[in-house]
Amino acid sequence: MAALKLLSSGLRLGASARSSRGALHKGCVCYFSVSTRHHTKFYTDPVEAVKDIPNGATLLVGGFGLCGIPENLIGALLKTGVKDLTAVSNNAGVDNFGLGLLLRSKQIKRMISSYVGENAEFERQFLSGELEVELTPQGTLAERIRAGGAGVPAFYTSTGYGTLVQEGGSPIKYNKDGSVAIASKPREVREFNGQHFILEEAITGDFALVKAWKADRAGNVIFRKSARNFNLPMCKAAGTTVVEVEEIVDIGSFAPEDIHIPKIYVHRLIKGEKYEKRIERLSLRKEGDGKGKSGKPGGDVRERIIKRAALEFEDGMYANLGIGIPLLASNFISPNMTVHLQSENGVLGLGPYPLKDEADADLINAGKETVTVLPGASFFSSDESFAMIRGGHVNLTMLGAMQVSKYGDLANWMIPGKMVKGMGGAMDLVSSSKTKVVVTMEHSAKGNAHKIMEKCTLPLTGKQCVNRIITEKGVFDVDKKNGLTLIELWEGLTVDDIKKSTGCDFAVSPNLMPMQQIST
């Protein structure tokens, strides 16, 4: 009772001191603030919630693919007709949904994103000079937003060193004739403990448009499954944060320790009128199929690579797998082995594809495919995910490539002026020296063009980052100083065959063995 009286007294004292703007009484150590300066404002009409967004504003727009996007708020912007927007978002949805709608209506002037993906209109506008696009590594984008919300003006990261991100010159805007009108600027470089890092500046927005699952009437917010992604850091990095939710509950419905975003970051709240929650890539398994498939292996060549790649897994390992061959290799993980699969959109403990009635729009992998999770799995935000990746907590990264150099340089994200998919999370995934990087790819491109080369001719994803190359013809180990060593060779091929199809010289291991295949 004495403690309650003291608390009550402190509250009165705090209120009195604040209202009079005077000093606290001598001898008082602290007081409880009861300021009413900021309250979350609730809306019923999404247009009302965004109508004051002016032309030329910078918007932070949450979501990953179509998962966790603020559908109702994007629809409201279509109605207000606001123009010349700078949209900061991991990607731009698809042609006819998500931010793709604002691209089609020509309301966006510049995108700051990591991935163009399958949005053909996004790519068309960029390559034709209609849209400015600042492509940024996914983890760097997440950290720039996190830093902006935390009041950190800039930070150093190893991601992007030795690439166009560091060197500058990456096209931001094309002229109609295909020449570069605006190019990215070089980054400052510093060395710490013998490793190179580049300086990245924080990102803040005028407004953040965020999708969450539930909010209470105080303004506290929680997310659902992998729909957390970029939504969480964006909540904290804007002058005005507008959150749309599926349900609003009474104060006290959430345990304090379960709240993902405290009310201090939330300025406006609205319950979305309706949600389509479209699934970009519905991937399913059938009853009795323990893993499920993301497409077919694609014949002997791909299956050969997949079955060799599966031997890279070790019990207890944390691994991040790219779409295509790397992800298909996970189908061959032994049931006697535990491999923890991490997905950069915020999942640790990926399981098989869902049955038809298990598919969930709020649970996808980095390839935007529907997935399930295993017991012991966890969900987290994009900035947290890339802290795991950049910090070297992931043991293995397996991904595809367009080109790999003799000394382990990797190129897999763009063909200037022709094809721009964006680097996504790849630059971050290969940035940690603590993580083993394995490239899986066909040995040659169309027309038997070399993919393993003396020097990459395409823009780099990472410099001297690849540790091993697996193709249908053999396996190479990569040394940053000494180059390639052929350690495994497919049955029926000779070393001379490999020399003819490889665009650089390589050593041959004295212990050269037949190319291994996992038993099935």
UniProtKB/Swiss-Prot annotation:
It is found in: Mitochondrion. PROSITE patterns: COA_TRANSF_1 (PS01273), COA_TRANSF_2 (PS01274). It comes from Mus musculus (Mouse). Key enzyme for ketone body catabolism. Catalyzes the first, rate-limiting step of ketone body utilization in extrahepatic tissues, by transferring coenzyme A (CoA) from a donor thiolester species (succinyl-CoA) to an acceptor carboxylate (acetoacetate), and produces acetoacetyl-CoA. Acetoacetyl-CoA is further metabolized by acetoacetyl-CoA thiolase into two acetyl-CoA molecules which enter the citric acid cycle for energy production. One of its GO terms (molecular function) is succinyl-CoA:3-oxo-acid CoA-transferase activity. It is an enzyme of class 2 (transferase). Homodimer. Only one subunit is competent to transfer the CoA moiety to the acceptor carboxylate (3-oxo acid). The gene is Oxct1. NCBIfam families: pcaI_scoA_fam, pcaJ_scoB_fam. Keywords: Lipid metabolism, Mitochondrion, Phosphoprotein, Transferase, Transit peptide. It catalyses: a 3-oxo acid + succinyl-CoA = a 3-oxoacyl-CoA + succinate; acetoacetate + succinyl-CoA = acetoacetyl-CoA + succinate. GO terms for biological process: adipose tissue development; heart development; ketone body catabolic process; ketone body metabolic process; ketone catabolic process; positive regulation of insulin secretion involved in cellular response to glucose stimulus; response to activity; response to ethanol. The keyword Mitochondrion applies. Pathway: Ketone metabolism; succinyl-CoA degradation; acetoacetyl-CoA from succinyl-CoA: step 1/1. Transmembrane segments: none annotated. Belongs to the 3-oxoacid CoA-transferase family. One of its GO terms (cellular component) is mitochondrion. Residues 1-39 form a transit peptide. Its EC number is 2.8.3.5. This is Succinyl-CoA:3-ketoacid coenzyme A transferase 1, mitochondrial.
